[in-house]
From Swiss-Prot:
Protein source organism: Treponema denticola (strain ATCC 35405 / DSM 14222 / CIP 103919 / JCM 8153 / KCTC 15104)
Protein family: Belongs to the arginine deiminase family.
NCBIfam families in the record: arcA (TIGR01078), PRK01388.1 (NF002381)
Gene Ontology annotations of biological process type: arginine catabolic process to ornithine; arginine deiminase pathway
Active site, per annotation: 399 (amidino-cysteine intermediate)
SUPFAM superfamilies cross-referenced by the UniProt entry: Pentein
Name this protein carries in UniProt: Arginine deiminase
Molecular function terms from GO: arginine deiminase activity
Subcellular location per the Swiss-Prot or TrEMBL entry: Cytoplasm
Keywords for the protein's UniProt record, in alphabetical order: Arginine metabolism, Cytoplasm, Hydrolase
Gene: arcA
Length: 410
């Protein structure tokens, strides 16, 4: 049995990866918001309650919930050598250049014996007050403020969709768009390299060390043989070319077509799933703001290795989806019904970002009243979750989840 199986966006969800927000959110400060890609500072206690409610909804609907921090801890605890390599790599990727600082931080982290506590600490970041640095008579020492972060936190980790994406029986271990998020993929690397459940059992279609950026929020499994990827602020055309070649060259992958959806390269539309998600065989949520500028390209295998056939599809989005899903007539349900003010407001709070846990059953943010009422009237089973704090991170239920196993649809 495959340990990864995701061939659609709507097949019954069997197993999902989450990250419960932790102390990394406590290390968010107003002067770091832009650098760390946040617009506001969530209240951790409430964010955790909301996230627990999310996990509870999934569990009550038959989904096995596993956590990034647990899998990563199990991976690094496989041997002393793996643990040592992880700590050194973590420090190196945090751009700690002084050998003295590297040693002091290594000793500090290595003293944390519990593997889960170690993982959580690396996610939280390291404060200068935690380490007894001596005066090294260097400029870097003199400008190090007491109480400042020596290693920044990773507050975006609760959006588990982005660092890697499951595609069929394989994964794309992503190269993130922003410097501040590139370090997040270290946990996926160690899980797929060293965790006994996954090591050596999962095809890798993209590597975190590749140059062009690609993020999981732009990757949608339209069907067993069709993959959709957003050409967006966070995912480049070069990355789509590269992953398409890797998928087509993999003999075990059934994917024959990659559809590239070009959307405006702005933060409000940062990923394809921010503005477009599948919720049933024949239904998709969509933000009306992308309907005008959206372009779709069909990518298939070329006649030679490394060569692709690319053509722009001159058709409506509905017709494109009807062709590639085989679902018959497609209905696009606009965020807030297309009302300009309500759509912009609810789009800001991820009204189009839904997590489908089985055909027609979706998890949504409760605050998007207009969109949720429309979805209910369309006959969907709408499971609302609290989101007052989680939504401050600008990501919805799909962003906060990485399906590992789904039933295939027929």
């Amino acid at each position: 049995m495959a340990v990864i199986n995701v061939t659609s966006e709507i097949g019954k969800l069997k197993k999902v990866l989450l990250h419960r927000p932790g102390k990394e959110l406590l290390n968010l400060t107003p002067d770091k918001l832009d650098e760390l890609l946040f617009d506001d500072i969530p209240f951790l206690k409430m964010a955790q309650k909301e996230h627990d409610a999310f996990a509870d909804i999934l569990s009550k609907n038959g989904v096995e919930v596993v956590y990034l921090e647990d899998l990563a801890a199990e991976a690094v605890s496989q041997s002393a050598e793996i643990r040592e390599k992880f700590i050194k790599q973590y420090i190196n990727e945090a751009d700690i250049y002084s050998e003295y600082y590297q040693k002091m931080i290594y000793d500090f982290l290595n003293a944390i014996k519990d593997p889960k506590e170690l993982i959580l600490k690396t996610m939280e970041g390291v404060n200068a007050n935690e380490i007894p640095f001596k005066n090294t008579h260097s400029l870097s020492h003199y400008v190090l403020d007491s109480g400042s972060m020596v290693i920044n936190p990773m507050p975006n980790l609760y959006f588990t969709r982005d660092p890697f994406a499951c595609i069929g029986n394989g994964v794309s271990l992503n190269k993130m768009y922003s410097v501040t998020r590139c370090r997040e993929t270290i946990y996926g690397e160690y899980i797929f390299d060293h965790h006994p459940e996954y090591a050596g059992k999962v095809n890798r279609f993209y590597n975190r060390y590749d140059a062009p950026s690609i993020e999981g929020g732009d990757i949608l499994n339209i069907g067993k043989d069709v993959l959709a990827i957003g050409l967006s602020q966070r995912t480049s055309a070069n990355a789509i070319d590269s992953i398409a070649n890797n998928i087509f060259d993999n003999e075990t992958s059934p994917i024959k077509t990659v559809l590239a959806f070009q959307i405006p390269a702005i933060r409000a539309f940062m990923h394809l799933d921010t503005v477009f998600t599948q919720i049933d065989f024949d239904k998709f949520t969509i933000h009306p703001g992308i309907l005008g500028p959206l372009r779709v390209f069909e990518i298939t295998r070329g006649t030679k290795k490394g060569e692709l056939n690319v053509k722009q599809i001159d058709s409506t989005l509905e017709k494109v989806l009807e062709k590639y899903t085989g679902a018959g007539k497609i209905e696009l349900i606009q965020c807030a019904g297309g009302d300009k003010i309500a759509a912009e407001r609810e789009q800001w709070n991820d009204g189009s970002n839904t997590l489908c846990i089985s055909p027609g059953t979706i998890v949504v943010y409760e605050r998007n009243d207009v969109t949720n009422e429309i979805l209910n009237k369309k006959g969907l089973k709408v499971l609302e979750m609290p989101c007052g704090e989680l939504s401050r991170g600008r990501g919805g239920p799909r962003c906060m989840s990485m399906p590992l196993l789904r039933e295939d649809i027929r």
